[in-house]
């Protein structure tokens, strides 16, 4: 899988950058509320809500916060959020996709466009870069949940398209149409996953020099720090030395 380790490193770096728990919990709560509002407030009957709750648990979000976010969806004063996808090119021509939940799309667009302009990139139209990514479901388990062989066998039997296992855990990929069924089958064998989500996975990655890489990582940090930006994906690789230098 081209660029897989880099893809993981950059996503994990995002997790560490988001370690300001209040901001992270706010984003998780927003996704929980939106998921509950779009479907039933019962995670067992609402796959998107279940995935959001799993993500919140993985970050040790308190149970009270999770329940409050679910209840918020049914309140008369429940906020309304638009689900948007922004796409653009960062420094070095790297493709970037952002998933956004916002109560003010004009503000979100203005802020994101400003970030791209200041970084030397440009915000494009929807569809301008997403063709370079695959829309996939990913299911993640800790490494100690199963052996490599057992996870591979179970995932293939469940209908997964690909499995990547290393010391960091198991990542199982499936199409967006089947991944929830795959997740359900794996849960019956290995218990609850640490992550179940739809992602944009780059088909190929671009190796960039450290100067460009630093600009890109700063752009991604800016985007991730924005309250409305839920997820950021990009198709580049940087050196391990740069990741280490920047504390990643």
UniProtKB/Swiss-Prot annotation:
Disulfide bonds: none annotated. Pfam families: TACO1_YebC_N, Transcrip_reg. One of its GO terms (cellular component) is cytosol. The keyword Nucleotide-binding does not apply. One of its GO terms (biological process) is regulation of DNA-templated transcription. Keywords: Cytoplasm, DNA-binding, Transcription, Transcription regulation. Residues 1-21 are annotated as: Disordered. Signal peptide: none annotated. Belongs to the TACO1 family. HAMAP family: Transcrip_reg_TACO1 (MF_00693). This is Probable transcriptional regulatory protein Nwi_2729. It comes from Nitrobacter winogradskyi (strain ATCC 25391 / DSM 10237 / CIP 104748 / NCIMB 11846 / Nb-255).
């Amino acid at each position: 899988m081209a660029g897989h380790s880099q893809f993981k490193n950059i996503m994990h770096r995002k997790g560490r950058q988001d370690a300001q728990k209040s901001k992270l919990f706010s984003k998780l709560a927003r996704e929980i509320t939106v998921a509950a509002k779009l479907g039933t407030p019962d995670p067992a009957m609402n796959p998107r809500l279940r995935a959001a709750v799993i993500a919140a648990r993985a970050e040790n979000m308190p149970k009270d916060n999770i329940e409050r976010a679910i209840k918020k969806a049914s309140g008369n004063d429940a906020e309304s959020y638009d689900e948007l996808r922004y796409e653009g090119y960062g420094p070095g021509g790297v493709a970037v996709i952002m998933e956004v939940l916002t109560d003010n799309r004009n503000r979100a667009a203005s802020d994101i466009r400003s970030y791209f302009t200041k970084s030397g990139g440009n915000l494009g139209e929807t569809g301008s870069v997403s063709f370079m990514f695959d829309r996939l479901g990913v299911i993640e388990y800790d490494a100690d949940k199963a052996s490599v062989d057992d996870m591979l066998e179970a995932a293939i039997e469940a209908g997964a398209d690909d499995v990547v296992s290393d010391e960091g855990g198991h990542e199982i990929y499936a199409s967006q149409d089947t991944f929830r069924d795959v997740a359900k089958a794996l849960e019956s064998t290995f218990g609850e996953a640490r992550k179940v989500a739809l992602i944009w996975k780059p088909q190929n990655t671009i190796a960039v020099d450290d100067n460009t890489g630093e600009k890109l990582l700063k752009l991604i940090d800016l985007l991730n720090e924005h309250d409305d930006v839920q997820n950021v994906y990009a198709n580049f690789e940087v050196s391990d030395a740069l990741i280490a230098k920047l504390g990643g």
